[in-house]
Amino acid sequence: MPANPWIFAALAAVTALAPACDLGSLPAVPVAAGAPVRLLVLPEAGRSAVLDLLAGAQASLWMDMYLLTDEDAIAALEGRARAGCDVRVTLEPAPYQDEGANQAAFDRLAAAGARARWATPRYTYTHAKAFTVDHARLVVMTLNLTGAGLAGNREYVLVDDDPADVAAAEAALAADQTGGQAGAAARVVTSPDASRPALTGLIEGAGSSLALETEELTDPTVVAALIAARGRGVGVTVVWPGPAAGAPSVFLSLAAAGIDVRALDGPPVHAKAVSADGRTAYVGSANLTPTSLDHDRELGLALADPSVAAALAATIAGDAARGASPSP
């Protein structure tokens, strides 16, 4: 896939301004280094950026997906299954409390020969949005495979070819197919076991800057950690979907603490991403809510990767500049 020149331009601008940071300033929860990871920013990257990853599978395509309704995405999975690819898809039975939302995709995938499974009731929701390709590539997304996710919302995608990350993700995906459980991993972080410490570790470990873009933010521990970070001199930016008028009290409280809080009207924010000090980052499916962190199946990547973290920070800064401050 061709590189996105906008990302590299943004990265260059932010990297030039990023302060030096030694290993001692990394988060309290270790964020492991590893193979380079590519960041895709949607909607700018276009829906084909994700669809091409699906269509490129030859031997295997394993997936957890909260909501699968996009015709092109379903067709890509059907096509891979009919071509003999080992397609395994675990779907949430009731996304947005709608028990029929994923039924058409489930039926079509099963008819095409894929191993379609409903997610275990072990979790409140299986909210993950991730897949592996040919046991060699991990794709972690903030988006559901819907029309809005692929072509309308502010979303992020990490494309990761690190073998350890792929293996860890596949252990989780395989467990979700059978209702089992997988062990801990270094960079692949899942709810309900690891998302909370990974995300609070990123926030608590920040030394100079924090940039967050999130659809939902209600968790009291996360809110307290953000306010504490601002109290120790960290510049904190939070972008959420808004609207700015009549903002929830949590965003008014963050703004009162000196945090730069911005409501973005468009593109609609469905992202779940954190950049700390322009050097460490989280991208994944976890919203900053108690349910998402403690009760759902979520999957994300927490990593020490300045290229990803700086590009995230640049995108969030651009969104913040176009956003509005919250008001009661």
Question: What kind of feature is each model-predicted range?
Answer:
Residues 1-7:
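Bacterial N-terminal signal peptides that target proteins for export
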Residues 9-18:
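Bacterial N-terminal signal peptides
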Residues 314-328:
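Short, low-complexity, Pro/Ser/Thr/Gly-rich segments in the mature regions of secreted, periplasmic
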Residues 21-58, 64-206, 216, 220-280, ...:
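HKD-type phospholipase D/PLD-like phosphodiesterase module
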Residues 7-8, 292:
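Hydrophobic alpha-helical segments involved in membrane association or supramolecular assembly
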